């Protein structure tokens, strides 16, 4: 009799357990929806179809239109995801290094160190470029080795001097992270996170790093006046006396070209563009950086050899060093600009009017 009651008890327990397992779960059952719930058995009509909100890149007076790749339109969802990835050390092999470590916001997304340090504590061999108005660049890296922001974002992940990771490992980590799974679904409507979409998101974020609110911008709008020293520096900058405008003219303050500006004699320790093109006349040439926010982006040049703007001006004032590929624009090579002390002070005063404090302080 006791055995009979025992079996009835066991049977009842199993029956209750089975009924519990069969309790229907309401949710979205459409696997193509953003909020798909694989555990749902009854569709409750909550499915959200994939759609993104375009991020409006502002049209800026004096700036050309930014060219956005057709296969990577800028969206609010993509920018949010890209910013999270940019700040997340999950991309590095040991989860200790993020993009932001070598491109710090308070330094206009550059590095105050001469060379950045990777996860192994090994220094790189070039100064980290400032990420400012990069959406208008035609090529990337000091040597022009990348032709798009998307292409450029691939390299630091696997570089042994930087994040020293593999894309296989990055993809595995991201696909095991439910927050990232949801964010990539919202931005790109994908279920499996791959390297192509990682760099697309980062590139979208980088295109939003726009600076156009410096003192000089306000001067051009007629909102404020320059000091006499700043105005004198402005005149020097745009004259043959200062010779700056040839490479740093227009409101972008760069020419999207490569120049040998007389830093070294031959043989070059760093071939720059020449290493990429294998053309001898390109040896020693490096990409012209923008002068916007130059006050925040020391040290200067591709190898960070100059610690101050005064040192940079003195380099051009002295005429630089001769080599067979030195740029023709260095007209006064061997002679120098021969600026007076006051003229150098005025020129630096003008360069500092290109500083955009909102860019480095804005939390949006």
Regions found by a protein language model. Name each.
Residues 50-155, 217-327, 358-364:
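Short glycine/threonine-rich turn/loop motifs
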Residues 96-97, 344-346:
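Alpha-helical scaffolds flanking conserved acidic
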Residues 324-333, 339:
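C-terminal soluble interaction/assembly domains
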């Amino acid at each position: 009799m006791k055995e009979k009651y025992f079996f009835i008890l066991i049977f009842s327990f199993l029956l209750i357990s089975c009924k519990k397992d069969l309790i229907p779960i309401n949710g979205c059952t459409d696997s193509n929806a953003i909020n798909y719930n694989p555990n749902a058995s009854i569709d409750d009509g909550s499915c959200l179809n994939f759609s993104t909100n375009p991020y409006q890149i502002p049209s800026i007076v004096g700036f050309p239109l930014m060219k956005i790749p057709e296969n990577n339109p800028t969206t609010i969802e993509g920018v949010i995801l890209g910013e999270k990835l940019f700040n997340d050390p999950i991309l590095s092999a040991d989860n200790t290094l993020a993009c932001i470590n070598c491109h710090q916001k308070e330094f206009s997304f550059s590095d105050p160190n001469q060379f950045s340090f990777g996860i192994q504590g090994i220094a790189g061999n070039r100064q980290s470029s400032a990420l400012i108005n990069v959406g208008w660049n035609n090529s990337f890296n000091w040597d022009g080795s990348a032709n798009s922001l998307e292409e450029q974002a691939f390299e630091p992940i696997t570089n042994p001097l930087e994040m020293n990771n593999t894309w296989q490992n990055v993809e595995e980590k991201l696909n095991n992270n439910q927050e990232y799974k949801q964010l990539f679904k919202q931005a790109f409507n994908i279920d499996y996170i791959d390297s192509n979409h990682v760099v697309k998101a980062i590139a979208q974020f980088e295109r939003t790093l726009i600076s156009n609110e410096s003192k000089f911008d306000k001067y051009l709008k007629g909102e404020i006046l320059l000091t006499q020293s700043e105005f004198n520096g402005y005149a020097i900058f745009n004259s043959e006396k200062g010779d700056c405008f040839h490479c740093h003219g227009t409101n972008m303050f760069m020419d999207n070209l490569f120049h040998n500006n007389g830093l070294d004699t031959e043989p070059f320790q760093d071939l720059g563009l020449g290493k990429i093109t294998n053309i001898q006349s390109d040896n020693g040439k490096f990409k012209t950086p923008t002068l916007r926010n130059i006050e925040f982006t020391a040290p200067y040049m591709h190898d960070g050899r100059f610690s101050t703007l005064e040192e940079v001006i003195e380099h051009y004032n002295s005429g630089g060093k001769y080599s067979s590929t030195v740029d023709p624009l260095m007209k006064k090579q061997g002679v120098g600009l021969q600026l007076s002390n006051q003229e150098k002070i005025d020129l630096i005063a003008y360069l500092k009017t290109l500083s955009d404090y909102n860019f480095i302080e804005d939390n949006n």
